Amino acid sequence: MKEEVSELVPSLRKFAFSLTGNIHDADDLLQNTIEKLLTKPLPQDATLMAWAFRVCRNLWIDEYRAQKVRASAAVNPELQAQDEAHLDEALSGGITLKQVSKAMGELPPEQRETLSLIAIQGMSYSDASEVLEVPAGTIMSRLARARSKLSNMLNPQQEVVL
């Protein structure tokens, strides 16, 4: 089991980073995921890959909920807006990886998860639907919405042609 889990580590690390947007949080999430994978038995009706991504996602959701409560008291919106304004001034020109990461962070969690599994991890719709426990049609609609929102966030002045 350890060998199979270790083969999934690079993909799980990318997925964890796409969820958290921070390498340190991603590594913490990855560590917690691996710990759970190695201590809990694989469900009989699941593949290791789908189960591993599901465990990672569920741990992230748990932490996301807890962090949301903690962050609401700690964040100073005025300072954060000031920092973002200075960063925007410093970055002129094309779209940066940081902008894409920030935009992905603003997507609803279910769209961010779907986009990450399909576009970053290269999963098929059926594999992603197994990981997220939703029908393939839901994966397709979430992916379309995520791509549309991401495009609008990164290119706000782009005209929509009907």
Sequence positions of predicted segments:
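Arg/Lys-rich amphipathic alpha helix in sigma70-family domain 2
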Residues: 43, 55-75, 93
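Short, small-hydrophobic-rich alpha-helical interface motif
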Residues: 12, 16, 26-37, 55, ...
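C-terminal edge and immediately downstream basic/flexible tail or linker adjoining helix-turn-helix-like DNA-binding
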Residues: 1, 72, 126, 130-133, ...
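Internal acidic/polar
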Residues: 70-97, 124
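A short, charge-rich alpha-helical start-of-domain segment used by transcription regulators
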Residues: 1-14, 18, 24-27, 43, ...
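C-terminal flanking helix
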Residues: 13, 34, 108, 112, ...
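Sigma70-family region 2
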Residues: 31-48, 67
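Helix-turn-helix DNA-binding module
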Residues: 105, 109-113, 121-138, 149-152
